[in-house]
């Protein structure tokens, strides 16, 4: 009977409690809380209903095993069950799915053919199956005999994207359930192993969702360890997998020494000491970010040697050479192709402006010249006539490029001017973008008027008080007094005073850079829309400028004040663009997530249920952050070249991390409450009452936040029946502790870090991380070209201050205000460079995974009930998308529907590839 029970599945792969108190009607019996949740049933699941088999799983038994049983029954009736069990051997079959590259270079093709040849003579891919049980004789996991993948040589020329290889293992009846598999690649070339499925065990197919590069044994001699899709908490790890679990984590941690190879899979920490390049020029030296002077999150360690001129700076790797990230974090082929196409587009877009800038004036003359970037193509825009081509040989090359790739040299029309060419000029549109644009996370309710600075007057002087008075705004309050407007929650503000003022002297000393520290006061009208009623422009009190340190600009009353107002709004837009890019986008959704990702790979086994939950939300983030260090935030990179703050941009980012960033305030509800945009209200659907009811970012964001939170709670409660399980989960606690104490070491002593002691604590922490990686990043990223591609709407930098009557430039401003306006804006080359970059950053790649989607959705976990719950989560995301579409057609929602008004789709979950101004990917992948 022992043998029969083993065969018929009484001991399943999933070695947990046999309690049947599950709300999911699962085929498996797994200990959990007996609580029904929103996602327990999925009405939209297209898969056929499963039959519930309460008596156990019907085994898939191989023919060899059946024959052996028949012989054993007839010929060995007198033997003991133990001896019978030892004598039974049977075969199981492995199917390995390998993903091919679509394009190979000559070297890769040559090595592939060499591997095909050597595979015939024994240099194979070797697999070894590991049991969940320990062999009592060796005190090590039970193992199968080694097996090789068959027909590698025959299939080497296959053009299919996925190629399936098979292998056969011989195991005996005492083997137990498979829990891991080792892979040894004796070829010269790495390969991408997508999955392995084992068939022939009593429990049915066993899945290994690998999605990993397997390196050649010559580069990495140790065997690759891959686990089944069955999740285990550390305390529940089967005895046969415990050593393997810890060994794999040790492999991923490394020893913190040496320079990393591109084929490595090691996750470790370092400071941002590779932004500058002091070996080339002293002007390219930059301070290290991370430490007491410039606090910052940690990034992935590469181990490169120090520069010659600064032992504390790491030697840079410049394009086209790749930066190190662990091999499985690198972009897959389709993502690489999308990036390469965008780089080509950027090069072509900037080639002609670079040529023109050397021979013609660098400023735009009028709005028509900007418009022609989208309508006529760059050559027509630049006015290269036949006689000019004759004089300059280089433009002949450009002509060829123009004829052969005309589409690449013409910019797409940004959405902000696609419906209404002049919408960006209107005050209501300027204000609307504070709640429905690309940076809707800085607006806050005014609680006292005039606003008060939090800067230290002993450091920044006594002139920190605001120049705003009641007289500046009283005529714009629909008959209310200022106090009444405050009490009825009608006054709001976008305040960049404190974040910019400490840096203005250095910024304004840069060539071609001029900035104020701005405050914009907004009034909530009876229609639920906002209007700007005053803009305060501040300079340091000891500024070298001849201008007053503070001035207030109010809505225009004549032609002169109209141009003053437009220039003031442009300076606000420049402040906003800098904070958006350097703080809200890069710092809060890119850099601050990297430590959590590094710690997850170092401390959470691939078998850990929380790792499986987080996995899709970590995809590509380390790679895109490495690319950012190489080209975007580097010395003289895109950010320094295109934004007002120039080389001081990352210092502003560091100051924001030091003074403003708090993980406990990064979740949407907490952030809305902190900014005074909402108050707790248990009667509302999300427990919050928005003080601006038509706040598209918050309205749609709360839908996604709630769905993510419910999904996370469903998942967490599945594995943690009580708080003690969380407190004693060694891997989970190590992950959170390392994220704080190492990854965010400069904030390690902060009292605001949430505890990780209860189920609710874990739900909150994981929900916040997933929110930041998905919806928050999408809201801040994918509208960059649709809103910022028309540079006058939100110029990334300004080159001139606003003149007043005492300024010598005031006369030229009065004589030709349009010329002064464009001379204040970015130059032609700065504009086209910025447009090319934000076009790339706003692009969805074809392999994007969106919220509610997963690779291998039915086998990413071996917990069938969680698979069902995930399908329920996906269905909820689909309902949210329909609700967002409905809201965008509702004329009562004036901040997202109306003549010339862009619909708010940045949190609409799905998208086609390209620049769409919608779509919520699972992770920070661009």
UniProtKB/Swiss-Prot annotation:
UniProt binding sites for Fe cation: 585, 590, 777, 781, 926
EC number: 1.13.11.12
Names of the cofactor(s): Fe cation
Tissue: Expressed in leaves.
Localization: Plastid, Chloroplast
Induction: Induced by bacterial pathogens (e.g. Pseudomonas syringae pv. tomato), ozone O(3), and wounding.
A Pfam cross-reference name: Lipoxygenase
Catalytic activity, reaction form: (9Z,12Z)-octadecadienoate + O2 = (13S)-hydroperoxy-(9Z,11E)-octadecadienoate; (9Z,12Z,15Z)-octadecatrienoate + O2 = (13S)-hydroperoxy-(9Z,11E,15Z)-octadecatrienoate
Molecular function GO terms recorded: linoleate 13S-lipoxygenase activity; metal ion binding
SMART domains assigned: LH2
Keyword field contains Plastid: yes
Organelle transit peptide residues: 1-58
GO biological process: anther dehiscence; anther development; fatty acid biosynthetic process; lipid oxidation; oxylipin biosynthetic process; pollen development; response to bacterium; response to ozone
Cross-referenced SUPFAM superfamilies: Lipase/lipooxygenase domain (PLAT/LH2 domain) (SSF49723), Lipoxigenase (SSF48484)
Cofactor stoichiometry and binding remark: Binds 1 Fe cation per subunit.
Cellular component GO terms, alphabetical: chloroplast
UniProt-listed InterPro entries: LipOase, LipOase_C, LipOase_C_sf, LipOase_CS, LipOase_Fe_BS, LipOase_plant, Lipoxy_PLAT/LH2, Lipoxygenase_dom_3
Keyword flag Transport: no
Pathway it works in: Lipid metabolism; oxylipin biosynthesis
UniProt family annotation: Belongs to the lipoxygenase family.
Primary role: Plant lipoxygenases may be involved in a number of diverse aspects of plant physiology including growth and development, pest resistance, and senescence or responses to wounding. Catalyzes the hydroperoxidation of lipids containing a cis,cis-1,4-pentadiene structure. 13S-lipoxygenase that can use linolenic acid as substrates.
PANTHER family assigned to the protein according to its UniProt record, in alphabetical order: LIPOXYGENASE
The name this protein goes by in its record: Lipoxygenase 4, chloroplastic
Species of provenance: Arabidopsis thaliana
């Amino acid at each position: 009977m022992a043998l029969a029970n083993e065969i018929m599945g009484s001991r399943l792969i999933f070695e947990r409690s046999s309690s049947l108190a599950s709300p999911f009607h699962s085929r498996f019996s797994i200990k959990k809380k007996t609580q029904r949740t929103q996602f327990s049933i999925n009405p939209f699941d297209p898969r056929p209903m499963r039959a519930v088999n309460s008596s156990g799983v019907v085994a898939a038994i191989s023919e060899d095993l059946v024959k052996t049983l028949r012989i054993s029954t007839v010929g060995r009736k007198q033997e003991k069950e133990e001896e019978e069990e030892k004598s039974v051997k049977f075969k199981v079959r492995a199917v390995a799915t390998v993903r091919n590259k679509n394009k190979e270079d000559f070297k890769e093709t040559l090595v592939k053919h060499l591997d095909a040849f050597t595979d015939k003579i024994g240099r194979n891919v070797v697999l070894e199956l590991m049991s969940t049980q320990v062999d009592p004789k060796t005190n090590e996991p039970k193992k199968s005999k080694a097996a090789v993948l068959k027909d590698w040589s025959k299939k080497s020329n296959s053009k299919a994207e996925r190629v399936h290889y098979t292998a056969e293992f011989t195991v005996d009846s005492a083997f137990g359930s498979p829990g891991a598999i080792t892979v040894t690649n004796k070829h010269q070339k790495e390969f991408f192993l997508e999955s392995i499925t084992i068939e022939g065990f009593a429990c049915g197919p066993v899945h290994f969702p690998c999605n990993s590069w397997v390196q050649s044994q010559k580069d990495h001699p140790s065997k690759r360890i891959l686990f089944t899709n069955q999740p285990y908490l550390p305390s529940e790890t089967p005895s046969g997998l415990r050593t393997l679990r810890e060994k794999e984590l040790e492999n991923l941690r490394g020893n913190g020494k040496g320079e990393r190879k591109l084929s490595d899979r090691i996750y470790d920490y370092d400071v941002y000491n590779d932004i500058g390049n002091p070996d080339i020029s002293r002007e390219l030296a930059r301070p290290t970010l991370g430490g007491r002077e410039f606090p910052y999150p940690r990034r992935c360690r590469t181990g490169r040697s120090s520069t010659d001129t600064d032992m504390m700076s790491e030697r840079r790797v410049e394009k086209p050479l790749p930066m190190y990230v662990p091999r499985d974090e690198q972009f897959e082929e389709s993502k690489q192709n999308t990036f390469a196409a965008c780089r080509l587009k950027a090069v072509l877009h900037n080639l002609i402006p670079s040529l023109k800038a050397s021979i013609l004036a660098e400023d735009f003359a009028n709005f028509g010249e900007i418009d022609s970037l989208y309508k006529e193509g760059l050559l027509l825009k630049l006015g290269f006539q036949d006689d000019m081509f004759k004089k300059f040989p280089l433009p002949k090359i450009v002509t060829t490029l123009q004829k052969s790739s005309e589409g690449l040299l013409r910019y797409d029309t940004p959405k902000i001017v696609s419906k209404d060419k002049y919408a960006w000029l209107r005050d209501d549109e300027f204000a609307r973008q504070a709640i429905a644009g690309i940076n809707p996370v800085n607006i806050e309710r005014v609680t006292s008027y005039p606003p008060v600075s939090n800067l230290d007057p002993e450091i920044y002087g006594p002139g920190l008080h605001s120049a705003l008075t009641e007289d500046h705004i009283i005529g714009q309050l629909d008959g209310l007094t200022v106090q009444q407007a405050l009490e009825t929650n009608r006054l709001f503000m976008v305040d960049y005073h404190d974040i910019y003022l400490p840096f203005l002297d250095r910024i304004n000393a840069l060539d071609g850079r001029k900035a104020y520290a701005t405050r914009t006061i907004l009034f909530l009208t009876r229609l639920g829309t906002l209007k700007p009623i005053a803009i305060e422009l501040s300079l340091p009190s000891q500024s070298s400028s001849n201008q007053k340190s503070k001035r207030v600009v109010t809505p225009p009353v004549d032609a002169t004040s109209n141009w003053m107002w437009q220039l003031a709004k442009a300076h606000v837009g420049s402040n906003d663009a800098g904070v958006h890019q350097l703080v809200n986008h890069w710092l809060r959704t890119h850099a601050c997530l990297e430590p959590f990702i590094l710690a997850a790979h170092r401390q959470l086994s691939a078998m850990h249920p929380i790792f499986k939950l987080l996995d899709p939300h970590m995809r590509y983030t380390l790679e895109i952050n490495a690319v950012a260090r190489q080209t975007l935030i580097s010395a003289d990179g895109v950010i320094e070249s295109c934004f007002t703050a120039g080389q001081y941009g990352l210092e502003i980012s560091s100051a924001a991390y030091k003074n403003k960033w708090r993980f406990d305030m990064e979740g949407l509800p907490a952030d809305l409450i902190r900014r005074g945009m909402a108050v707790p209200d248990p009667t509302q659907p999300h427990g919050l009452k928005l003080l601006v009811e038509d706040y598209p970012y918050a309205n749609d964001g709360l839908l996604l936040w709630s769905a993510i939170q419910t999904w996370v709670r469903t998942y967490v409660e599945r594995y943690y029946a009580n708080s003690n399980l969380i407190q004693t989960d060694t891997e989970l606690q190590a992950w959170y502790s390392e994220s704080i104490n190492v990854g965010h070491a400069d904030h390690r002593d902060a009292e605001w870090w949430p505890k990780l002691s209860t189920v609710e604590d874990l739900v909150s922490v994981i929900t916040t991380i997933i929110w930041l990686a998905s919806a928050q990043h999408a809201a801040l990223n994918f509208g960059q070209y649709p809103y910022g591609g028309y540079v006058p709407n939100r110029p990334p930098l300004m080159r001139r201050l606003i003149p007043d009557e005492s300024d010598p430039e005031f006369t030229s401003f009065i004589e030709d205000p349009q010329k002064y306006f464009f001379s204040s804006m970015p130059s032609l080359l700065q504009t086209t460079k910025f447009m090319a970059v934000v076009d790339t950053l706003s692009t969805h790649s074809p392999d994007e995974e969106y919220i509610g989607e997963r690779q291998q959705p039915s086998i990413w976990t071996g917990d069938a009930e969680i698979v069902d719950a995930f399908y329920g989560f996906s269905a909820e995301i689909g309902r949210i998308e329909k609700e967002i579409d409905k809201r965008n057609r509702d004329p009562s929602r004036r901040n997202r529907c109306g003549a010339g008004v862009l619909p708010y789709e940045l949190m609409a979950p799905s998208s086609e590839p390209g620049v769409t101004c919608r779509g919520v990917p699972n992770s920070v992948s661009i």
